[in-house]
Amino acid sequence: MKYTFHIVDVFSSMGVAGLAVLGMTATLAGAQTVEVKEKPPLYRYVSSWTFPPPHSADPDKDGSAGNQKILAAALADGTLVGYGDEENQVHSAERFAHASWGQARSIARLMKVVDALHKGGSSSTPLDSSTRHWDQIYITSFYNWKAGSWKGAYVYAGTSKLKPDAPDADDAIRALSSFYVPVFEKMLADGIIVEYEIDREMIHTTDARAQIHFSLVVPNAEGLDRFRDALGVALDQNSLIVPAFGSMMDNFKEQFDFVKVNATYK
């Protein structure tokens, strides 16, 4: 997919891992960045599976109604602020095919829903038991969304590993957000995206060094070109961002996902 490859190249070239301790101030001084206020922490629980086609589009038809009932109730009473399910559009042997997630303003609220899903949601199937699966919990203080539901929206998501000698993930995210949050906020106001977040792994079941994760939700296919164009303009106007944030990434080995999502935000 030529279109997706172009977007990956844009993010890959700038790198999202952070800034070196030495030279951080000097590098950012010439770039157009602003101080961004951190929001209260937001927690995101993600369950991923590598369901083989044709199951990847809807791997749990029998149990999805039970899950949706629990998630909708949790959103209505304020336990969750968002939830959704995703299907990867560019399949590979290493990456997930299907993922489900929920967002809450505390770990306690998040795990309350996870526990309810385990007890009263869909039951395990032979396909579930034979499929590779992993869970991750992310935390972020840099995020925003538009309330509502979107079916068949698109998500660009990327994960970058920090070098062993890099600043910690929180410092890297703060530096990253000084450029990206204003860009994403403008996209949100213009209707190009309906949600964004820049976060790090808090708890995970994969063996990896500290990681930074970003994701953006584009409401429809027509918005994909608008997103690409707006991001390209922002990067062209801030050329120093590329070397600044690329300096701490682990050999430019990002992981990127281009997925379709059904998402609801409160």
Predicted regions and their residues:
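Bacterial N-terminal signal peptides that target proteins for export
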Residues: 2-18
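Compositionally biased, low-complexity segments enriched in small residues
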Residues: 3, 21-23, 127-128
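C-terminal segment of classical bacterial N-terminal signal peptides
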Residues: 19-30
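Short S/T/G/P-rich N-terminal loop/turn motif that feeds into the first structured element of a domain
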Residues: 30-119, 126-266
